[in-house]
Structures are given as structure tokens and as C-alpha cells.
Regions:
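Polyanion/phosphate-binding surface patch
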Residues: 23, 27-56, 92
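Active-site-proximal loop/short-helix segments
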Residues: 29, 151-152, 156-158, 212
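Short, conserved secondary-structure transition motifs
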Residues: 142-155, 170-176
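Acidic, His- and aromatic-enriched active-site or binding-groove loops in soluble protein domains
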Residues: 43-52, 157-180
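Short secondary-structure boundary/capping segments
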Residues: 39-40, 154-157, 412
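Positively charged, Gly/Ser-enriched RNA/tRNA-binding surfaces
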Residues: 2-18, 29-32, 62-74, 78-136, ...
Length: 436
């Protein structure tokens, strides 16, 4: 839990730095609220039935409930964050950070703004969080649903198959192109020639402005209105990312599809990279740790008059991050402190419980994080051992002589250095030592 608390604090501080306010939404929704929003992943939604026969579902993510919240409260402009549990009928795999109940950490910007400015800020937030958590090298892959849909159109894919084709392309990060093509042709009903044309495009990745310019010159793609719009916005986005100083960690990747039905524009996914070595020329993808995109039409689905509120957001894959950090701590044999206690109030005397209670109360009232052992007459050795076992850096020791002299013996646990401090200055001295 200490690692989790550190990660949560890091993420929340970043969200607040960018001006977000926190909101909360219910753990369960009407089933009809969630259906039709997640494509093929809808089968992973947990269904509930209450005593009156009403069909409910546990929330699958934090995005759809947020959109319903905006529509219900007629909110047209907000920057929010939300950290809460979501639920999926998935196959759990703890080593890969996959669970049926897990936390998501979401940041979203809702409102009518000039193109790509909020989108760029969301990517900047992902960059900041992954940099602060020091998880190693990472890459943020981006694409646009308009470019994908334009690509499908020029490849001869019927409109009715856009969503299912998108879900299949989304599997390219886990499967080979041959497997993906076989699914397109065998299960989705695409012609082999159409699948091959898609293959030519989705193999174009690891690009930036150069790839955007190349696609703008593509004789087929450049004639498609949706694709042109998406490429124009992608070019603008890269200009903003360059100004933010993060373009070197961004890759325009046509194979990125993100299968959720509600995305309408830019989509992105952050992956951790395993460093290259003598046997590997390329860094290896260790899995996704964040994802998100633009969803301009989702709020309108819940508004009685169909009023749209453009939104863009990102979700941090916190469970996978926990899993990685816990493995690193285990491998390093590093001892993690589970509390923030600054000082243990101790005594070598018997029958000094009242003195300890009085002193610890003074420290608590002064804002010092303090503990004591819950025994009337603990041995001093046991008290100091507790400090070492739990990583408490200081011990405030008070005995008969210290009580008579109006001082407290402050002991640095690591060095065993001891110094007498006037009792009224004890809290101030503890702060000074810990700050230095």
C-alpha cells in the first residue's frame, strides 16, 4: 500500500497542477447507459439485477459515467480528475496487471476549445506522470479515428464494418499481422485484397511530421475528407507537442486503433520499453500503461436534446504500474516504509506511561507524526528495535532525569547519536533535523 499511496499522490499532484477538480460517479449504472459504447469489449461488462428487476451494470470505465454526469447536470466546460475502481469480466493475470476489479486514474477536459490544445495537454500530462514515476523509457503512440476511418474507406471497407475492423486492428499490439488479417477475412468478412490494402497502411508507424506529410501526399488518402481533417489536426498537434518539449517521446502510428466505440478523433496509448541490448536492436514493448483520446459525441448520447460537449481525456493504467514498481522493489531487496512516522516516544523507566502520553499528545498537537508502543512498561531495547524495523528515523526518549531537567533526549536511530533538547523546542528540532 505504501507504493500505491506514493503513485496516487504523484498522479493527483500532476492532475491538480493542471487545474483539474475531482468529481465522483456511481459504481453502477443502468445497463442501457453502458451498452453500445465499448464495441466488442461490451461482453466484459458485469451485469446486476436489483430486487425490482431493474437491469444494472458495474461501471466498465470512468469515461461513460462522466459523460452521463455532464449531460445530466448540463455542464459544458470542466477539467476533472477521478480515481476509482472499475470492473471487468476479464481473465485475471496478476503478472500483467490484469484484474476484474482495479483502479483507473482519469483526467478529462470537456468544452468547446480551439483544436488540439487540450489534446496536447493530455499528452503532456501522460509524459509528466511517467517521467515522475521513473518507470524507465516509454513511448506514446498516437493516431486519429478520422484517419483510420478514412483509411478503411479508401481500402474499400463498408461503413458497417468500420467498428469491427477497428477492434481487429487494435489487436496488432498483441498479434501478428497474419493473425489479424485472418480474423478480418475469416470472421469479419473482409475481402483479402481490402485486408492487404489495410496492411500496407498499418505497417507505417514510428513516424512524426514526416509520416504526416507522406500521407497528405498519398493519392488515395489525401482525397478522403475525414482523413485530411485528421492529418491536418495531427500536424497541428505535433507543433504543440514540440512546443511542450515532448515530441521526441511521441510516435504517429497507423496501427493504433483503440477499439472503444466512443472515440471520434485523436487516440493515444503509452507503452513502457525494455531497453535494447546486444541481442536486440529495437527496444521491446512491455505493455500499455496509459491510454485515451477524443470523444466529442458521447455526452450527446445522454442529453435529451442531443447537445454535444467535446471531450478529450486520458486514463492511467495504475494496476500495471503498481505491478512493475512492486517487482522492482522486490528485486532490489529495498525496504519500503509503510508509515510516515517521524519519531517514536520512548522511555527507559517503568510506570512512565502518563509521561509518554503527555509528550506524544504535545507532539501530535504540534503537527509531528509520532508513535509509541502500546505497553505500560516496554523495554527500551524493544522500543528502539521497533524504530529500526519500521524505519522511524528519530526516538524521543524521556526518563526521570530528563523529566527533572525539562529536556527530552532525541536519538537519531541510524547513527545512535543522542542530544538533549529543551522540551518546548522538541517539535521544532524534529522538523529541523528531518528537513536537513
Amino acid at each position: 500500500m505504501a507504493i500505491r499511496e506514493k503513485v496516487f499522490n504523484t498522479i493527483i499532484s500532476c492532475f491538480k497542477r493542471h487545474g483539474a477538480e475531482v468529481i465522483d460517479t456511481p459504481v453502477f449504472e443502468l445497463k442501457e447507459t453502458l451498452m453500445g459504447k465499448y464495441g466488442e469489449d461490451s461482453k466484459l461488462i458485469y451485469d446486476l439485477k436489483d430486487q425490482g428487476g431493474e437491469l444494472l451494470s458495474l461501471r466498465y470505465d470512468l469515461t461513460v459515467p462522466f459523460a452521463r454526469y455532464l449531460a445530466m447536470n448540463k455542464i459544458t466546460n470542466i477539467k476533472r480528475y477521478h480515481i476509482a475502481k472499475v470492473y471487468r469480466r476479464d481473465n485475471p493475470a496478476m503478472t500483467r496487471g490484469r484484474y476484474r476489479e482495479f483502479y483507473q486514474c482519469d483526467f478529462d477536459i470537456a468544452g468547446h476549445f480551439d483544436p488540439m490544445i487540450p489534446d496536447a495537454e493530455c499528452l503532456k500530462i501522460v509524459h509528466e506522470i511517467l517521467s515522475m514515476l521513473q518507470l524507465g523509457d516509454f513511448l506514446i503512440k498516437i493516431n486519429d479515428r478520422r484517419i483510420l476511418n478514412g483509411m478503411f474507406a479508401v481500402c474499400g471497407i463498408p461503413d458497417s464494418l468500420f467498428h469491427s475492423t477497428c477492434s481487429t486492428v487494435d489487436k496488432l499490439n498483441k498479434a501478428t499481422w497474419e493473425d489479424v488479417k485472418n480474423e478480418m477475412v475469416g470472421e469479419k468478412g473482409l475481402l483479402p485484397e481490402a485486408a492487404d490494402r489495410i496492411g500496407e497502411y498499418v505497417r507505417l508507424h514510428a513516424g512524426g511530421l514526416g509520416l504526416i506529410e507522406q500521407l497528405l501526399q498519398d493519392p488515395k488518402l489525401s482525397q478522403n475528407k475525414l482523413a485530411r481533417e485528421g492529418l491536418g489536426d495531427m500536424k497541428l498537434l505535433f507543433e504543440y507537442l514540440t512546443l511542450f518539449g515532448i515530441a521526441d517521446k511521441i510516435s504517429f502510428d497507423l496501427s493504433l486503433a483503440r477499439g472503444l466505440d466512443y472515440y471520434t478523433g485523436v487516440i493515444y496509448e503509452a507503452i513502457l520499453l525494455q531497453p535494447q541490448n546486444a541481442r536486440r536492436e529495437e527496444p521491446v514493448n512491455m505493455g500499455s500503461v496509459a491510454g485515451g483520446g477524443r470523444y466529442d459525441e458521447l455526452v450527446g448520447m445522454f442529453d435529451p436534446k442531443g447537445r454535444k460537449v467535446p471531450c478529450v481525456g486520458v486514463s492511467i493504467g495504475i494496476e500495471r504500474i503498481f505491478s512493475i514498481m512492486e517487482q522492482e522493489v522486490e528485486a532490489s531487496k529495498e525496504k519500503i516504509r509503510t508509515t510516515e512516522t517521524q519519531v517514536l516516544v520512548a522511555t527507559p523507566q517503568k510506570n512512565f506511561l502518563d509521561v509518554r502520553l503527555n509528550l506524544i499528545s504535545e507532539l501530535w498537537d504540534s503537527g509531528i507524526k509520532a508513535e509509541m508502543l502500546y505497553k505500560k512498561n516496554p523495554k527500551l531495547l524493544n522500543q528502539l528495535q521497533y524504530c529500526e524495523d519500521t524505519g522511524i528515523p528519530l526516538a524521543a526518549i524521556i526518563g526521570e532525569q530528563e523529566l527533572k531537567d525539562g529536556v527530552v533526549k532525541l536519538r537519531v536511530v541510524a547513527s545512535r547519536e543522542e542530544v538533549d533538547i529543551p522540551r518546548e523546542k522538541l517539535a521544532e528540532e524534529i522538523r529541523r533535523r528531518l528537513e536537513s
